[in-house]
Amino acid sequence: MGCRFLLVFVFICANVLTAADKPEQVYRITYVQKSNEWYKNQAALWEKVLLQDKSNEEAWMNFYKAQRYVKFNDDGHIVENRQKRLDGIITEMKKHIPDTYTYFYLSALNAKHVNEIDIGSLENAHNRWPEHAEILYELILFNEVKGDKDKVIHYARELYASEDIARGLLEYNANMLLSTQPGSILFTNGDNDTYPALVLQKACLFREDVTVINVHMAFGNREYLAKLLEEHNMKIMPHQLSKTNIADFLGEFVNMFSEKYPDKTIYMAATLNKEYIDLFQENLYLVGLVYQYSRTRMDNFIVLKENVQKNLRLDYLSRDWYNEKYPATPLVRHLNQNFIVIYMNLAEYLAEKGDIGEAQYYQNRALQLANQSDNQKMIQKIKESQF
């Protein structure tokens, strides 16, 4: 793999906080992450609120989210029958708060598959309570999979106008897209490297040439994948790909696609699960916030240098516009640690070329980001690098 500074790319880690005695707001886990113990504690606290008032929408919202994000029991084993438990919460909500935004939204969120979403109820909820931006993610997801491009654009514009997506996430996704060549394929992993990218493309007409494929959406919706590729004048047979697991599916897709379209470049977002990245380890080359797939050896450091110095938008990394209390600040700072890998690989490359001054410049930029996130292990590793 074309990557010298061997720090693992990060997605999002949990923040461990001491459990409070009073219930706190439970944010979407893609926006703010807490420890498993924190979610268990909040679920118990919000349940107490519901025992006093079963018509409390805020309590239902936070209770459901907390229960949804509890992944492990006290003994450390994965929670069993989790979906059954969540289904039970939705059933209780239908009894106590049936004609409410909270019930309609969480019913959609609880769907086990996008095809099970009651789109009529979802749209009705949005029309009646348009101030709630979080429902827009489900509306974009449903219409993206169903292929209703006009509605995707409409809701993407609404989401952009709402400013619900943290500015740092938009900047990160913009740089992810800017790391790719025109007309390429980009595989993404989750909400934070997919929704902001789609919003930039659909609402801001930014790098629309890139075909963004969320691996989980594509694996579970083969018709959607086929239509998405056809929109960009590409055609393969996704139904022939593995239905066993995502890793096999992705490996077969890359082989099939690169055989049929050798002139199209495939990229893997740095935020992809390590399991998927490891599949192609010998054929992936770091060129920015993405890995470029290539069957032949390439000098990726020339591309990396060009991207960093000419193509990427990096000013925001040294200017933190939000204070510590902004909910998404820890998430954005943690995600921005991926730039450390970029800077340190570039620094080592420049040092080998004899450009010590420029190498130290990028080393210092990496150190600045590590200090922002207070990652002591990474700070030490950067300081140990001698240029």
Predicted regions and their residues:
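Bacterial Sec-dependent N-terminal signal peptides
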Residues: 1-24
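Phosphate- and divalent-cation-binding pockets in alpha/beta enzyme and binding domains
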Residues: 195-199
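ER/secretory pathway lumenal C-terminal domains and tails of membrane proteins involved
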Residues: 20-182, 200-387
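Short His-Asn-centered micro-motif
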Residues: 187-191, 215
